[in-house]
UniProtKB/Swiss-Prot annotation:
It comes from Buchnera aphidicola subsp. Baizongia pistaciae (strain Bp). Pfam families: Ribosomal_L27. This is Large ribosomal subunit protein bL27. Belongs to the bacterial ribosomal protein bL27 family. Residues 1-25 are annotated as: Disordered.
Length: 85
């Protein structure tokens, strides 16, 4: 009687979609109110003046103006602010 061993099933073959994180508007760019500035996991960048933080830590503009990135504070954190024009 001819026999052939059954082929095993692979445990690979899955992958998640990329989340498109990162800086969407860079320093010096002029943006409108409500525009997303940074998409991130956690608070790599912190909200400064005229910027708010969503529940998934996305930073967005609350007024129109120019984007400004600056390091300040005791922990040398990076803050994102909007300078009104």
């Amino acid at each position: 009687m001819a026999h052939k061993k059954a082929g095993g099933s692979s445990r690979n073959g899955r992958d998640s979609h990329s989340k498109r994180l990162g800086v969407k508007h860079f320093g010096g760019e002029t943006i409108r109110s409500g525009s997303i500035i940074v998409r991130q996991r956690g608070t790599k960048f912190h909200a400064g003046n005229n910027v708010d933080c969503a529940k998934d830590h996305t930073l967005f503009a609350t007024s129109q103006g120019k984007v400004k990135f600056e390091k300040k504070g005791k922990c040398n954190r990076t803050y994102v602010s909007i300078i009104p024009e």
